Amino acid sequence: AECKVTVDSTDQMSFNTKDIAIDKSCKTFTVELTHSGSLPKNVMGHNLVISKEADMQPIATDGLSAGIDKQYLKDGDARVIAHTKVIGAGEKDSVTFDVSKLAAGEKYGFFCSFPGHISMMKGTVTLK
């Protein structure tokens, strides 16, 4: 199984996939985020955050006041399973996490916590 995926983000507030599939045989999984747009991160920055589906909007809401220096995530937010930094055009960042953090039967998702982006920039994380 390939235990990594690359997800691209754009100036049109979109990810290039709606689902990240993780093979149960993977001990760790790496997500690399790229940005193929042309806008800087303070204008059209994106990150990729993984959490339970039910926690996605609350994490994004709480992260608004944290600001870009903290990746628009509340300090020490235990609901966040993994996240990349906020990146701008031409940049990339990756994060590796233990697949054991994902429980069978629970619904997980990924999203961008940059203010206003979650409505268009989200998807599911599936354990296969």
UniProtKB/Swiss-Prot annotation:
Pfam families attached to this UniProt entry: Copper-bind
CDD domains: Azurin
Cellular component annotations (GO), alphabetically ordered: periplasmic space
Lineage: superkingdom: Bacteria
Annotated localization: Periplasm
Gene3D superfamilies (UniProt xref): Cupredoxins - blue copper proteins
Disulfide bonds: C3-C26
Binding residue positions for Cu cation: H46, C112, H117, M121
PANTHER family the record matches: AURACYANIN-B, OUTER MEMBRANE PROTEIN H.8
Protein role: Transfers electrons from cytochrome c551 to cytochrome oxidase.
Identification of the protein by name: Azurin
Species annotation: Pseudomonas putida (Arthrobacter siderocapsulatus)
